Swiss-Prot record:
Species of provenance: Drosophila melanogaster
Cofactor details (free text): Binds 1 zinc ion per subunit.
Effect of inactivating the gene: Causes lethality during development. Induced silencing shortens life span.
Tissue: Widely expressed.
Domain of life assignment: Eukaryota
Protein name from the UniProt record: NAD-dependent protein deacetylase Sirt6
Additional notes on this entry: Overexpression in flies produces robust lifespan extension in both sexes.
The keyword Nucleus belongs to this UniProt entry's keyword annotation: yes
Alphabetized GO MF terms: histone deacetylase activity; histone deacetylase activity, NAD-dependent; histone H3K9 deacetylase activity, NAD-dependent; metal ion binding; NAD+ binding; transcription corepressor activity
Length: 317
């Protein structure tokens, strides 16, 4: 289904480096590096995860730039030989491990480039998530700008009209938006990133003691540069990816292994139990529409904390 998403985007030539070879650390090295990562997480007060397409491949959704990625094969005139529909896909071990790490207090925020909706399906609360490129399960009102969860993947990408009325009158708060029309909120190449998601992503990346990139080559900007925001303040940066990334030379630690394997080991070392996916916690399986908007109050509250942090770092140290 990521093939259909890619096909729905406008033509664009600069897709970055495609098909770079993957490398794998030995089991012994992976174990040592996971121990090091677990220690870094323990010592950090603010951990931010940056997730890319590589965390969803074990759900049957192809990535884009891997050896068998959508765009890599597209260049050869081919299609991936596996391509689960978005509606069939279920959150991976990584998605569920992220839930556990947040609930146990080890991770404070997640910034995702993925549009597949698997963070949403996993039950991750919106207050912990920035979705920089949109979400195939979200409908956004053109008038009131509120976002709502769709029970199935929306029909379009590129912020096109879904020809449906705003769902605000159907939500639990009973607020109504007259004459609002819903659009998909999946970005095309020329679109600006969603303001609140980007602002929260920038702030969390900057104040992080530890930024961890999971399953991404970090080629798309500005998303791929966010994990570097904390380096000038002495923060740490870890990469878990099978291919080389744009910022390997700046990382404190690089783990070349499947993300599912890494987070399973890290959770075990931290004494964190990874839950199974449950439809009861999946907003796409609920009977009533659920709102998915980032409240402006959340952005303003964290912005005040961010300003204090920046003032302390740049003026008092």
């Amino acid at each position: 289904m990521s093939c259909n998403y890619a096909d729905g985007l406008s033509a664009y030539d600069n897709k970055g480096i495609l098909g770079a070879p993957e490398s794998f650390d030995s089991d012994e090295v992976v174990a040592e590096k996971c121990q090091e990562l677990a220690e870094l997480i323990k010592k950090s007060g603010h951990v931010v995860l940056h997730t890319g397409a590589g965390i969803s491949t074990s759900a049957g959704i192809p990535d884009f730039r891997g050896p068998k990625g959508v765009w890599t094969l597209e260049e050869k005139g081919e299609k991936p030989d596996f391509n689960v529909s978005f509606d069939e896909a279920r959150p991976t071990k990584t998605h569920m491990a992220i839930i556990a790490l947040i609930e146990s207090g080890y991770v404070q925020y997640v910034i995702s480039q993925n549009i597949d909706g698997l963070h949403l399906k996993s039950g991750l609360d919106r207050k912990y998530l920035s979705e920089l490129h949109g979400n195939i399960y979200i409908e956004q009102c053109k008038k009131c700008r509120r976002q709502f969860v769709s029970p199935s993947a929306v029909e379009t990408v590129g912020q096109k009209s879904l020809q449906r009325a705003c769902k605000s009158s159907m939500d639990s708060k009973g607020r109504s938006c007259r004459s609002g029309i819903l659009y998909d909120n999946v970005l095309d190449w020329e679109h600006d990133l969603p303001e609140n998601d980007l602002e929260m992503g920038v702030m969390h990346s900057t104040v992080a003691d530890l930024n961890i990139a999971l399953g991404t080559t970090l080629q798309i900007v500005p998303s791929g540069d966010l994990p570097l925001k904390n380096l000038k303040c002495g923060g740490k940066f870890v990469i878990c990816n099978l291919q080389p990334t744009k910022h390997d030379k700046k990382a404190n630690l690089i783990i070349s292994s499947y993300v599912d394997v890494v987070l399973s080991k890290v959770c075990k070392l931290l004494g964190v139990e990874i839950p199974e996916y449950s439809e009861a916690s999946d907003p796409t399986k609920q009977s009533k529409p659920m709102e998915w908007t980032i409240p402006t109050s959340n952005v303003n509250t964290f912005h005040r904390q961010y300003k204090k942090y920046v003032y302390f770092i740049y003026y008092l140290l």
